[in-house]
A protein has these predicted regions:
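Conserved catalytic scaffold of divalent metal-dependent phosphoesterases
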Residues: 1-52
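Divalent metal-coordination and catalytic microenvironments
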Residues: 16, 57, 81
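Internal, well-ordered alpha-helical scaffold/interface segments
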Residues: 39-43, 51, 56, 61, ...
Length: 179
């Protein structure tokens, strides 16, 4: 369940959720802390024949580097978290993932990695906090399940910081130990 594209020398799988489901959470940052789950992700990379999966949907961003199943090279999960909601505490911006053969010009990258010749950035999407909150409350007033689940995130951002986005496999092991 993916679309493929090539950007420079990067073969990319594009999904909404994960490699198995449109609504999947297999590329969520909290699942990537589990070694057995990273093995499953490695299998998805081999099945798709890609170097990276770009995804969204899982609320918190993570750019997770994994060793390939054959031990030769690396693969990346490039998860932007949420385009339409804050991703970091105290930062009202949404995020999109830019994957390009040239570096990003400007200062609106919240996290970045380079894979061979390809530049990957979590680019901030400027949102007006007051307008976002007003539109949200008009759609999902206090007392609704959505308000209970998301309003505090929209108002202040989640308890997550830009320094937590880029992770290498050894860091995923340490993050799991901290849970």
């Amino acid at each position: 369940m993916w679309q493929t594209a090539s950007v420079g020398d990067l073969r990319l799988g594009i999904v909404h959720g994960d490699a198995q489901s449109l609504a999947g959470w297999g590329f969520a940052q909290e699942h990537l802390t589990d070694a057995a789950h990273r093995d499953q992700a490695r299998a998805w990379f081999e099945q798709a024949g890609v170097d990276a999966f770009a995804c969204s949907h899982t609320r918190l961003p993570v750019y997770q580097r994994l060793r390939r199943a054959d031990g030769q090279g690396q693969a990346w999960v490039l998860n932007n978290g949420a385009a339409g909601m804050p991703n970091f505490q105290g930062d009202s911006a949404g995020l999109l993932t830019r994957i390009a053969t040239t570096p990003l010009a400007g200062s609106n990258s919240r996290a970045s990695v380079v894979h061979r010749t390809v530049h990957i950035d979590a680019v901030a999407i400027t949102l007006c906090p007051a307008q976002l909150q007003q539109r949200f409350v008009a759609q999902w007033p206090p007392g609704s399940d959505a308000h209970a689940s998301y309003f505090s995130r929209i108002a202040a951002g989640p308890d997550y910081h830009a320094g937590q986005v880029v992770r290498f496999e050894t860091e995923a092991v340490l993050a799991a130990a901290a849970l």
